[in-house]
From Swiss-Prot:
Function (record text): Major role in the synthesis of nucleoside triphosphates other than ATP. The ATP gamma phosphate is transferred to the NDP beta phosphate via a ping-pong mechanism, using a phosphorylated active-site intermediate. Negatively regulates Rho activity by interacting with AKAP13/LBC. Acts as a transcriptional activator of the MYC gene; binds DNA non-specifically. Binds to both single-stranded guanine- and cytosine-rich strands within the nuclease hypersensitive element (NHE) III(1) region of the MYC gene promoter. Does not bind to duplex NHE III(1).
Organism from which the protein derives: Homo sapiens (Human)
Protein name: Nucleoside diphosphate kinase B
Cross-referenced CDD domains: NDPk_I
Taxonomic lineage: Eukaryota, Metazoa, Chordata, Craniata, Vertebrata
Domain of life: Eukaryota
Amino acid sequence: MANLERTFIAIKPDGVQRGLVGEIIKRFEQKGFRLVAMKFLRASEEHLKQHYIDLKDRPFFPGLVKYMNSGPVVAMVWEGLNVVKTGRVMLGETNPADSKPGTIRGDFCIQVGRNIIHGSDSVKSAEKEISLWFKPEELVDYKSCAHDWVYE
């Protein structure tokens, strides 16, 4: 199947604290994507610095790491046709003020510093992020019984 790919999605501490984990998972499942891996953890500062290494020179970097370390996160891997691009559309813009209603950030966020969710921005970054957060044996390979009802 063309463009069957995986993406990394993380529900940030504010999304966990606000009780949005189930709603976010529901949206990805209802879209037809397949959950491949999930863990609930409090990421270390070092782990977060590695995750956000591309932003290390930005003025908001220390605050971002502190915010992401302030509570537990839900790290997930989702698989599906064009899941990276479609997942980003489902999330909405990084700045919730620019997000359309119906997107996760458009429906549940107000400020960019509390935008509840992270999603890989490319297939390449998804591969990097997945390998940073999950060991290969933690990725569960199975065929969803819904697969044939989602894909031609």
